[in-house]
Amino acid sequence: MATTIKLEGEARSEFGKGVARRLRVANKIPATIYAGGEEPAFVTLPMRETTLALRHTNALFTIAFDGNTKMAVVKDVQKNPVKRIIEHIDFLEVKAGEKIDVEVPVFVEGTPKGAAVAFVDIQELKVRADVTNLPEKIVVSVEGLTDGTKVFAKDVVLPEGVELDIEDPEESVVTVEVPEDATESTTAPEAAAAPADAAAAPAADAK
């Protein structure tokens, strides 16, 4: 279920780098809400509340400004490359009951068998869902899986109401395998034991 966040903003009619700098000094973020073929809405949002809200992946925003209220999702976030502060946000207006495509981060849970380790092949999975049901993450269970097992996109268990939306459902999302260093560490003692046994043989013959 998507996290719904309400933000109180203000309409803005001034633009440009100078205006944007003044807004940031005043702890505000300039933003644009796009709505298909309609005219976009230009707003300013409180910096602290908005920055905290953006920690939620695929959150659904209700933005109130000057008597208007728009429901939207984040389209793009522009950050200062040095200070990493938010300089501008693009939102996409959505309607209740509308389905959209989103990229959702992939996480794994559980423990594979033996020395096997789970590797995430796709960091984000593209899915389609209602705007009120956008998942923040997709969890793939690797509990008890053995070395060489692959979890394909078509096999990922998605939340109810969420559909896979990628071109190749056979694409590997998670691979379970034993790392090379783990294999080497288990075979090294056996290799070391062979010379020791060979050295013991002449000693026994000398008796």
Swiss-Prot record:
Matching InterPro entries: Rbsml_bL25/Gln-tRNA_synth_N, Ribosomal_bL25/Gln-tRNA_synth, Ribosomal_bL25_b-dom, Ribosomal_bL25_C, Ribosomal_bL25_long, Ribosomal_L25_dom, Ribosomal_uL5_bac-type
Gene Ontology MF term list: 5S rRNA binding; structural constituent of ribosome
GO BP term, pick one: translation
Biased composition (Low complexity): 184-207
Gene3D superfamilies: Ribosomal protein L25, beta domain (2.170.120.20), Ribosomal Protein L25, Chain P (2.40.240.10)
Region of interest: Disordered: 171-207
Protein origin, superkingdom: Bacteria
Entry keyword annotation includes Ribosomal protein: yes
GO cellular component: cytosolic large ribosomal subunit
Keywords, sorted A to Z: Ribonucleoprotein, Ribosomal protein, RNA-binding, rRNA-binding
Quaternary organization: Part of the 50S ribosomal subunit; part of the 5S rRNA/L5/L18/L25 subcomplex. Contacts the 5S rRNA. Binds to the 5S rRNA independently of L5 and L18.
Role summary: This is one of the proteins that binds to the 5S RNA in the ribosome where it forms part of the central protuberance.
Similarity annotation: Belongs to the bacterial ribosomal protein bL25 family. CTC subfamily.
Protein name in UniProt: Large ribosomal subunit protein bL25
Organism lineage: Bacteria, Bacillati, Actinomycetota, Actinomycetes, Bifidobacteriales
